[in-house]
Amino acid sequence: TPFNDREMLELFLTAQENGRKYPTEAEFEAAGFNLIDLEFARSHVRPRAILKDKSKNLYPNIYENRNLWMNIPMGVGKAIGGYPSSTFSDDTYSMWNYTNLFGSWNHGLFQAPGSWVDAAHKNGTDIFSGIKFFESWTPGSESAKYREMITAKNPDGSFKYAEAFINCLMFFGTDGINYSWEDTGYAD
């Protein structure tokens, strides 16, 4: 899939090196993207402020400025996971207006469905796109290779992929990333 985290960062790094924030349509197509499919992963809705109206709370004494972070899998992972399908449970999340921050842990970093990001933003919810696991227990885990790539630095000491990473998140409209802290891979 062209949504491979490494390939996506390289694509956005190339755009940055050519003086642009985002790849061109031709660059996306050359990387294997169908432009119509790419739009399923893009959000086109700017975030709204979260609705806070104590008079509409079922329990009026609940702390008005509560912050709920919902961190659950979407749908069935990379197989469908929130993209259009005939499986109702893959497409449904109905608690956006109660959630301040949503994080899904079964998509790649840049692969959350744009419709989910749109729904989140319409309800004042920030949304993380997918997750990156840095774990040693999964056979074939490539976390060491990814860690080596993401910590690469430019000659001036800045991180090589930092701006490309931010531009990629901005292009897709997501508000951040989700990292699993369950292993020792964060030491560096």
Q: Model regions: which residues?
A:
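N-terminal module-boundary/linker segments of secreted carbohydrate-active enzymes
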Residues: 1-86, 90-92, 96
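Chitinase-like catalytic core of GlcNAc-active glycosidases
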Residues: 61-188
